[in-house]
Amino acid sequence: TPRTMQSGFRSSLTYAPEEVQDVLNKKIQEEERETLRHSTPVTRQLERDMHANIRYQKNVLKVVSLFSGAGGLDLGVKLAMLSCTGGAENSLTFLADRQNFEKNTKNIDFIYSNDIFPAANVSYTANFGLDVVKDSRDIRQVIEFPDSDLMLGGFPCPGFSAAGPRLLDDPRNFLYIHYIRALTQSKPTFFIAENVKGLMTMARGQVLKQITEYFSAAGYQVVAHLVNARDYGVPQIR
C-alpha cells in the first residue's frame, strides 16, 4: 500500500534494478505467505484437483488468462494468431463460422482462466468452451498458477480510470502484484497486461513507471504502448 512522505522516505523509483527486484521478491513472498495462511486443506485439495484437470497439449501455445471477464482480450489474441497464419485481411472472416474459427485456431490453447465475477465466468465459458479450467476465486486466494507460454490479464483499474475516482490507496489498484506473482510461478515466455489510458498519467506517470519496473524485475523486457480500440474493429473510441 502507498506510504506517506516521511523523513528518511526513499522513493522506490530511485532504487537500483537489483534493489527493485529484492523489494518485489519480498512483496511476492509476503503475499504468498498470506495466501497460504488463509487457505484450508479443503481449498488446497480443490486447487490440486483443478490443476489435474488442466490439459497440456504439445506444439500449441498454452495461455493462462487472468481477470478474464468475458474473454475480450483472449479473443483478440486468437484473432492475432489468425492474422499471423491467414493474413490480417482474412482474420475477421473466420468469425462468421465458429467451427471454421475453432479449426483455424487449434495452435493456441487457453488452459486456465481466473475471474471473481460469476456472470463473467458464464460468458467466458460460452465463448471459449468447457475445456478451459475456470477458477472463480479471488486471485489473492490462488496458491499456485499453472505453467504457460503466454499470460494475459487486464488487472482492475478503478483508481486509474478517468471515468471514476483516481484513488492511489484503492486496494484494487495493487492487484497487479498478484499478476506478477502469477508470472513468477507460471513462467510464460511473454505476457500482455492491459489497462486504461489513465494509468499513464496517474501521479504524473510515476505509477506506470513503478509498475513497469516491477514487471521488469520479474525478468521481462517491458514495452508500454497506447492503442485505441477503434483501430482494431471495435465500434467505440476507447
Predicted features along the sequence, with ranges:
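Short, conserved catalytic or adaptor-binding loops enriched in Gly and charged residues
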Residues: 99-106, 127, 214-217
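S-adenosyl-L-methionine
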Residues: 1-101, 114-148
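Short beta-strand element of Class I
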Residues: 110-111
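Class I S-adenosyl-L-methionine
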Residues: 78, 121-125, 129, 141-148, 161-238, ...
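Conserved proline-anchored active-site loop of SAM-dependent methyltransferases
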Residues: 63-77, 138, 147-165, 190-196
